[in-house]
């Protein structure tokens, strides 16, 4: 039984939830207050004079004179060392280059030896993609040779279709291949026997080449449902959301009215008016439901 006659329970529940969300947003907007930003602490005036006096103190003349001289002396001392180090590095580099050249000459490789090895690589290793390219064609040919059995599918209006099958194919394979989308509506009959088990193979049914299968396509699919699915449907019917809607709204309104009475200072006039309107609307809905 629907909560409102002519309107589904899902629509009523959806509008109820949307209305509740709007009321909560309105209540939050009416009670929301913006706190003033805190004033930043200004720097203490006593600290600035000390910094200014420290920065304005002159450096002693001895330090100013000694620092450039010390820097020049260190530069003069470091220049011979750096020149000697650069000369040693150049000599080591020339010896290393000569050693590398000698090794390349002893090995019989030129400067482009790496390029010769890369160009010679494909010739020594033949491509491996050729066997894989020929393999699918061989499998297709094998599958075509295996499906050498022909079945005649005869309908009630005396029309026939031929099916290329394999003796190891199942009844379900024939339904999926030749009756796509109508698997649960097709009934296959062989020698007056209804073939209900889709896992049976053609060889187990003793179907020979050029055998006739009578096909019947029903308008309504009669699909067998397991016992667990039927039990789940019964539980779903027992736990109808419509029967829990009224107690849920009563509980929510009770909580809102409790907070409105205990914490009256947090509820503004628009929030209280919205709560009163929701209560009146829900009372009319509940009265209409229980009157029937």
UniProtKB/Swiss-Prot annotation:
Pfam families: ubiquitin
PANTHER family the UniProt entry points to: PROTEIN C7ORF21, TRANSMEMBRANE AND UBIQUITIN-LIKE DOMAIN-CONTAINING PROTEIN 1
Species lineage: Eukaryota, Metazoa, Chordata, Craniata, Vertebrata
Domain of life according to the entry: Eukaryota
Gene3D superfamilies assigned to the protein according to its UniProt record, in alphabetical order: Phosphatidylinositol 3-kinase Catalytic Subunit, Chain A, domain 1
UniProtKB keywords: Cytoplasm, Membrane, Nucleus, Transmembrane, Transmembrane helix
Domain (Ubiquitin-like) ranges: 149-222
Subcellular localization(s) per the UniProt record: Membrane; Cytoplasm; Nucleus
Transmembrane segments: 11-31, 237-257, 269-289
Native source organism of the sequence: Danio rerio
Principal location: membrane
Entries under InterPro entries matching the protein: TMUB1/2, Ubiquitin-like_dom, Ubiquitin-like_domsf
Region of interest (Disordered), residue spans: 34-143
Biased composition (Basic and acidic residues): 71-80
Family matches, as SMART domains: UBQ
One GO-annotated biological process of the protein: ERAD pathway
Protein name: Transmembrane and ubiquitin-like domain-containing protein 1
GO cellular component terms, A-Z: cytoplasm; membrane; nucleus
Biased composition (Low complexity): 84-94
Membrane topology: Multi-pass membrane protein
Function according to Swiss-Prot or TrEMBL: May contribute to the regulation of translation during cell-cycle progression. May contribute to the regulation of cell proliferation. The membrane form is involved in sterol-regulated ubiquitination and degradation of HMG-CoA reductase HMGCR. May be involved in centrosome assembly.
